[in-house]
Amino acid sequence: RVCADCPAVQFSDASGAASCKACGEGQYQEQAGQSSCLAHTTCAAGRRVIQEPNATQDRACEDCTAGNFSANANAAACEVCAPSTWNSAPAQASCSACVAGRVNGTQPTSSADHCVACDEGRSQSRDGQTACSPCPAGFVSAAGAPTCRACAIDTYHDEAGQSSCKPCADCGGGAKRKGCGGASEG
């Protein structure tokens, strides 16, 4: 009796077996004469598939680059981080949001440094937003503030988008103009 090696894609798990067995689903064998098949590699989240597996070859994976991600295993492609989100390392499964008071409205980015502070008189109170909003009349904010704050007692501002409040007019003797405060000069 002449023994022959099992071809690639098949194996024999017993010495002197009369026949070879096919590799099962999710397995491969690229070499002849083997006693088992190998399991296909799983591309983890943060990586993408660059070569699909078959009975004679394994799945090949590649890391997503910084500023990109894949949330699922065996992803066909990496996705670009959405505007006002970022990640700074390769092989990431998600992106982080720009924090409140900072935005990056149009471009995905690979660094939190690209999340820029809201200008004076504007704010953004939620993470991951793409634009800052002007403070309403009677409210002000410093650059990068996540929220606008109300003008203090005896101060006002009647215009939106301001960084400081105006003092109420002094009527003499320490008295202030009646009705002055918030958004009204009185």
PLM regions with names:
Residues 1-186:
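Disulfide-rich, cysteine-dense extracellular ectodomains and adjacent flexible linkers of secreted
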